[in-house]
Curated annotation (Swiss-Prot):
Family that this chain belongs to: Belongs to the cytochrome P450 family.
InterPro entries linked: Cyt_P450, Cyt_P450_CS, Cyt_P450_E_grp-I, Cyt_P450_sf
Subcellular compartments: Endoplasmic reticulum membrane
GO BP terms in the entry: flavonoid biosynthetic process
Gene name linked to the record: CYP75B2
Organism: Petunia hybrida (Petunia)
Pathway note: Secondary metabolite biosynthesis; flavonoid biosynthesis
Cofactor dependency: heme
Name used for this protein in its record: Flavonoid 3'-monooxygenase
Tissue: High expression in petals and ovaries and to a lower extent in sepals, pedicels, anthers and stems. Not detected in leaves, style or roots.
Keyword Metal-binding carried by entry: yes
Length: 512
């Protein structure tokens, strides 16, 4: 007990000493820092975040403006909450904000920064980005695997059509669909047997692992902001991360070892390509791939490429159930282009203008990543007359930017018409060029899988609109549907969407 007491007193004394020294020798900057709430001693503004940081920082922006400074423990943090401020960071000063700050999630779950998402900006990151751009996300690669996405969406449609009177947890089946579509491209096979969440018990387990990773990764870990407390793991976050990483690593190691030594035909999957690149110089500067980097890349693709798309589609269907006139108009458009004797195909999407507006409006109101992944200032800079110190962490409140009343009329309403000709934002896109809505980020660290994500989300939403009418479980009124958010790295629904799908096409459309 005496040793523990000595350790505790030493920690408290070191905190007080550091706080006094920091207060006494406060840095002098050539310009003022951005405004923000007054920090508490030691913990700073961590106390102001609450359980949903995207909402709390959006509320702060109403008081302090769209560029805020927060002191999170001993870490300088700046928050951008408007399109113009976001453009300053990710367009004008993009090169200065292209790396990630140290964080426990990258250390414990992303193979110690050896993945694409958290790797420092440099040769290794460029190598991983190039591999994804060429072999998975290029236009040719997306076109080559179009049939895979359509097959898995058709499997999803059959599963929903066969539900009968049984209520369906839509999010789980959507996750199975997106995971199998990505797995067939990456691994050459499905992860979940026949694509039915009811049949394969792995589906629920995998979904829970992905959601748990997103929730844990979205926690503001005190140890990241007060390094002296890191070893205590006060919130138990590091322990959860390590256990979750062990489960994912076992899953990915089995896949990798099973794949080695296989002989592939002309159409290789991504993993076989990655394995072959281990023996080549994948990039002039980047060097060769390692098994750890391959597993880290697979982890990125499985987590970021499945849960984000499925949660976006779940939000879209919830909004359409609450807005039956919008649903009916979308069905009318698709019926006119596709008919009722077959399912929507990817090549039909270019003709579906109203559907595209629905997808954009869903990305606006329900961005899968409400707070951007953090970036770090490599050097000090000036933004809008304020000083941004070197080493500051940058957070973009994507959720607040897309709900800014100065940029959007009736920002809380689901109104796809705003993106149509004659609407308020007919030319605004979601691909990182228009900062009013940036669900995939922008600049050098924009989401590598953006084009795949857009294609998959459009196809799934179009198919679900076209193939089914939607009823809530008995007693629920559409206007009373709970639209509360559950915060994590991705924006989940607080209550999973439980529905009765009612087929509306000719029977032959669901066969085959």
């Amino acid at each position: 007990m005496e040793i523990l007491s000595l350790i505790l007193y030493t920690v408290i004394f070191s905190f007080l000493l550091q706080f006094i020294l920091r207060s006494f020798f406060r840095k002098r900057y050539p310009l003022p820092l951005p405004p923000g709430p007054k920090p508490w001693p030691i913990i700073g503004n961590l106390v102001h975040l609450g359980p949903k940081p995207h909402q709390s920082t959006a509320a702060m922006a109403q008081t302090y403006g769209p560029l805020m400074y927060l002191k999170m423990g001993f870490v300088d943090v700046v928050v951008a909450a408007s399109a113009s401020v976001a453009a300053q960071f990710l367009k004008t000063h993009d090169a200065n904000f292209s790396s990630r700050p140290p964080n426990s999630g990258a250390e414990h779950m992303a193979y110690n920064y050896q993945d694409l998402v958290f790797a420092p900006y440099g040769p290794r990151w460029r190598m991983l980005r190039k591999i994804c751009s060429v072999h998975l996300f290029s236009t040719k690669a997306l076109d080559d695997f179009r049939h895979v996405r359509q097959d898995e969406v058709k499997t999803l449609t059959r599963a929903l059509a066969s539900a009968g009177q049984k209520p369906v947890k839509l999010g789980q089946l959507l996750n199975v669909c997106t995971t199998n579509a990505l797995a067939r491209v990456m691994l050459g096979k499905r992860v979940f047997a026949d694509g039915s969440g009811d049949v394969d018990p792995q589906a629920a387990e995998f979904k829970s692992m992905v959601v748990e990773m997103m929730v844990v990764a979205g926690v503001f870990n005190i140890g990241d902001f007060i390094p002296q407390l890191n070893w205590l793991d006060i919130q138990g976050v590091a322990a959860k991360m390590k256990k979750l990483h062990a489960r994912f690593d076992a899953f990915l190691t089995d896949i990798l070892e099973e794949h080695k030594g296989k002989i592939f035909g002309e159409m290789k999957d991504l993993l076989s390509t990655l394995i072959s690149l281990k023996n080549d110089d994948a990039d002039n500067d980047g060097g060769k791939l390692t098994d750890t980097e391959i597993k880290a890349l697979l982890l990125n693709l499985f987590v970021a490429g499945t849960d984000t798309s499925s949660s976006t589609v779940e939000w879209a269907i919830a909004e359409l159930i609450r807005n039956p006139k919008i649903l009916a108009q979308a069905q009318q458009e698709i019926d006119k282009v596709v008919g009722r004797d077959r399912l929507v195909g990817e090549l039909d999407l270019a003709q579906l203008t109203y559907l595209e507006a629905i997808v954009k409006e869903t990305f606006r109101l329900h961005p899968s990543t409400p707070l951007s992944l953090p970036r770090i200032a490599s050097e000090s800079c000036e933004i809008n007359g304020y000083f941004i110190p070197k080493g500051s962490t940058l957070l973009l409140n994507v959720w607040a930017i897309a709900r800014d009343p100065n940029a959007w009329a009736d920002p809380l309403e689901f109104r796809p018409e705003r993106f149509l000709p004659g609407g308020e934002k007919p030319k605004v896109d979601v691909r990182g060029n228009d900062f009013e809505v940036i669900p995939f980020g922008a600049g050098r660290r924009i989401c590598a899988g953006m084009n795949l994500g857009i294609r998959m989300v459009q196809l799934m939403i179009a198919t679900l609109i076209h193939a089914f009418n939607w009823d809530l479980v008995s007693g629920q009124l559409p206007e009373m549907l709970n639209m509360e958010e559950a915060y994590g790295l991705t924006l989940q629904r607080a209550d999973p969407l439980v529905v009765h799908p009612r087929p509306r096409l000719e029977a032959q459309a669901y066969i085959g």
